[in-house]
Amino acid sequence: MKLISWNVNGIRACITKGFEDRFKELDADIFCLQETKCQQGQVELELPGYHQYWNYANRRGYSGTAVFTKKEPLSVVNGIGIEAHDKEGRVITLEFEEFYFVTVYTPNSQSE
């Protein structure tokens, strides 16, 4: 199984630099992104053969995660159940028959 995790630091800018070609070339079974920095409806990716799951931050241009998987999961949960953290779109958990897959974009270590 091939897993890829990529902090894109803004998916819209990444798309203009050839993201979709690189995505196809890498041919991962599960591909996760952190720091997507987009809102629902701002990005439409054509990724045939993949199921797409997004967790958007409430704040525009901030954090956000996504997972693209060839196999459809049994369930998908956005967040960890703590509203203060979940509004930032930092976690997606996918349940598969034999394992759980979690992508996380963690905050930096600043004092706030």
Language-model regions: role of each:
Residues 1-47, 57, 62:
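N-terminal, active-site-proximal structural segment of metallo-dependent hydrolase catalytic domains
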Residues 37, 43-111:
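Structured beta-strand-rich core segments of catalytic domains in phosphoester-bond hydrolases
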